[in-house]
Amino acid sequence: VSMDKIKINNSLYANILTQGANLKATNCLFGNSNNFSGYISIGGSVEFENCTFANYANTSRNSPSLLFKDYYESANNQINVRPFSVAKFTNCVIDGNNKNELVCDTLSSYTSSFDNVKFDHCAIKSEDSLINLSLFNNCYLNYESNFKNVDSWDFDLNENSELIDLGTNSSIIDDILERPRSVPNDLGCYEYH
């Protein structure tokens, strides 16, 4: 499945939920949700480029904006690990009103390597240290997104956003609003103009 320039907001559980999916998403906004902006789980091939996972919902959620998980528990309490063949997050924003907006709940380290999993040039809100540093390449911890207006779900960048020009170059030439991308790209689905 390919997704380009899609906005998904206001879901009860998750704006995007994958389970063993083959998915490529570019310039997508996964906004406010009662639980997860993104729940990426149990294997498959997933690629997110210049996507924004931003959850500022006015609920008392305990879940992160983005949950990345490579296993599930069956009905008979058996743990089943399903590693990802590819899981790439490039130039993405993972933000929200909780202290930790990314949870990587993985067991693959016990059965395989993380060679195919990478967060590259992503802005991540987290008070936790990113323990498995091999997963993270040039990521920015707790940078100020400074979105225009999270209360009205406007996740476009303000002029004082720390996400401007932090991305790695890519073949994506425009943003979610079809505005041209700068070199280097801004992080997330919006390019500041």
Describe each region flagged by the PLM.
Residues 23-156:
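Predominantly extracellular beta-rich ligand-binding scaffolds that present long acidic/polar faces
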Residues 9, 33, 80, 188-193:
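Short, charged low-complexity intrinsically disordered segments located at boundaries
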Residues 1-31:
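Right-handed parallel beta-helix
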Residues 153, 158-193:
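Surface beta-loop-beta hairpin patches that serve as ligand-binding interfaces in beta-rich domains
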Residues 12, 17, 34, 57, ...:
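Active-site-proximal flexible loops/turns
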